[in-house]
Structures are given as structure tokens and as C-alpha cells.
């Protein structure tokens, strides 16, 4: 993880990798997701680790979904859980504080005009991500035999 000179802020395009992985089943080849952060995961560091696999990546925002240990660990670097107005609230809050260099949210407002409001372009993939996680990695992998729990470490 490394700190960035400029905040990654707004909606970024991602592409799927390892499409047969259940976590991204149903994803389009290219999809949008929100980011709001001052640091990043270094792609090359992830690729050097044989325990980690990048499932979705972005040229601009870096690795987005990383999976490890056959799905027992899942890392998401953006904010698919964000409501349509979350980035708007962050942007307006920082402007109201008079902060220097407040970044304009990338691909967030209709025609890049805040007065036209934001466009939520990530809802379907966010829902699919959480549905797949619950179905394939929580529900189907959860043992209901207390004696088996000790073997999951």
C-alpha cells in the first residue's frame, strides 16, 4: 500500500479478469465503481504474491477486487456500497471546509455539472458482488457442523 499525491475520487472503469471465479460471475467485461481514497495497492506487489489473484482492475484506479486463500479473504479497494449521493456529500463537505485542492469527482456528475446531479452507474455490479459473495463464499462455504469449524483455519 502506498500513499498518493492526489486523491482517487469519483467513478472509475474496471475490467474483469479470471471471469470463471464465482465472485465476479455475472459481471460485464467492463464496469464502473466508485473510489474515494488517498492510497493505493501496488499492482506489481499483488502480482508477486502467489496467494493473491486480481479479479477486477482499473488502468486509473488500480486493482479493485483481489481474492486470496480460495475465497476465504476478499479485498475490495473501492466503494461499491456507496449510495448515489455519497461522493456528492464528500465533495461538498470538503469544499465547505475550504480545503485546498479538492478533487472534482471523476465521471460522477451528469455532463460533469454538479447542478445536474450524479449518475449512479455501479448499482448492478455492486449488487452482484455482494450477492455472489454471500451465495458462493458465505452460504455455500459455511459449515454447520461445529466439529468442522476447527479445521477451517
Predicted regions and their residues:
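Pocket-forming structural segment of enzyme catalytic cores
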Residues: 2-86
Amino acid at each position: 500500500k502506498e500513499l498518493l499525491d492526489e486523491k482517487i475520487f469519483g467513478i472509475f472503469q474496471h475490467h474483469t479478469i479470471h471471469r470463471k471465479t464465482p465472485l465476479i460471475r455475472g459481471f460485464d467485461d467492463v464496469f464502473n465503481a466508485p473510489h474515494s481514497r488517498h492510497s493505493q495497492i501496488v499492482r506489481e506487489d499483488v502480482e508477486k504474491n502467489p496467494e493473491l489473484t486480481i479479479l477486477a482492475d482499473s488502468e486509473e484506479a488500480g486493482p479493485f477486487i483481489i481474492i486470496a486463500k480460495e475465497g476465504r479473504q476478499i479485498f475490495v479497494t473501492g466503494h461499491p456500497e456507496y449510495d448515489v449521493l455519497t461522493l456528492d456529500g464528500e465533495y461538498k463537505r470538503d469544499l465547505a471546509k475550504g480545503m485546498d485542492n479538492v478533487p472534482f469527482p471523476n465521471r460522477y456528475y451528469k455532463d460533469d455539472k454538479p447542478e445536474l446531479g450524479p449518475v449512479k452507474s455501479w448499482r448492478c455490479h455492486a449488487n452482484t458482488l455482494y450477492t455472489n459473495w454471500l451465495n458462493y463464499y458465505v452460504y455455500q462455504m459455511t459449515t454447520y457442523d461445529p466439529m468442522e469449524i476447527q479445521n477451517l483455519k
